[in-house]
Amino acid sequence: MLNEFPIFDYEDIQLIPNKCVIKSRAEADTSVTLGNHTFKLPVVPANMQTILDENVAEQLAKGGYFYIMHRFDEAGRIPFIKRMHNQGLIASISVGVKDYEYDFVRQLKTDAPEYITIDIAHGHADSVISMIQHIKKELPDTFVIAGNVGTPEAVRELENAGADATKVGIGPGKVCITKVKTGFGTGGWQLAALRWCAKAARKPIIADGGIRTHGDIAKSIRFGASMIMIGSLFAGHIESPGKTIEVDGEQFKEYYGSASQYQKGAYKNVEGKRILLPAKGHLQDTLTEMEQDLQSAISYAGGRQVADLKHVDYVIVKNSIWNGDASH
């Protein structure tokens, strides 16, 4: 039962260092394998309209990073798969669970993407289980990621249905207001929820939401994530699709949630909000900094590779120096 687990979030945890065994942090290997492919980092930009478009997806794939294209340009998905495959790049797309998506999946048989993410807010649902089974029947070689979920029961059910990985996180994101609108979610205890789910998982888990610092990537690995989905840290770059807005001479980029009125174009079942983020530099600079910080984390863990982070000790530090949403 959950009540037997300590409840904590990212800011409540500090990892405890081990003796360093590498001469330089540059020796630490940050690569991870998901399915049949290996990627430079265990992170994936959130599949949201203000985080990536086709050009950003292509840049990530060319650079050796994992990506998941969002599902909000439905007609563009098949041309996108062609565009990627024509360049020898992996195709990774998202689908929903509406009836017409079943026909869409059938259309992919001639040119199947390597990865499909079934992307709905409450992924522990019969509709998701049915879609997993459908994709596995029609496209047996495609790696299926399903989510989002927040309990071990959900992880087990989706894995048993055929999901190759599950995405854990209900509403902990910076522009997600599910917890406020519904009273449900993993906001405020996302890291404990990840740990709880990972103990039940037999397949990879993607931690999704609540990442505020690069150190949170190492903490996610420690508590069972194979890959970490990140929104706000990847938003606001020069290449990001969000609109650039000037306020008092300063440049900002918009960032909004996938169930916000800005994304939906209508105020109905809204569980996301819009914020403005100070415009950042290039996406590659952030990826490089994440890699260097993760290499440092691996060296503090006394390790040589990402998996070595899974074995470090930790302490729970309540009332820590940050508070979840405070600006760091």
UniProtKB/Swiss-Prot annotation:
It is an enzyme of class 1 (oxidoreductase). NADP(+) binds at residues 205-228. The keyword Oxidoreductase applies. GO terms for biological process: purine nucleotide metabolic process. One of its GO terms (molecular function) is GMP reductase activity. The active site is at C176. GO terms for cellular component: cytosol; GMP reductase complex. Keywords: NADP, Oxidoreductase. Its EC number is 1.7.1.7. SMART domains: IMPDH. It catalyses: IMP + NH4(+) + NADP(+) = GMP + NADPH + 2 H(+). InterPro entries: Aldolase_TIM (IPR013785), GMP_reductase (IPR050139), GuaC_type_2 (IPR005994), IMP_DH/GMP_Rdtase_CS (IPR015875), IMP_DH_GMPRt (IPR001093). The keyword NADP applies. Belongs to the IMPDH/GMPR family. GuaC type 2 subfamily. Catalyzes the irreversible NADPH-dependent deamination of GMP to IMP. It functions in the conversion of nucleobase, nucleoside and nucleotide derivatives of G to A nucleotides, and in maintaining the intracellular balance of A and G nucleotides. NCBIfam families: GMP_reduct_2, PRK05458.1. PANTHER family: GMP REDUCTASE (PTHR43170:SF5). This is GMP reductase. It comes from Streptococcus pneumoniae (strain ATCC 700669 / Spain 23F-1).
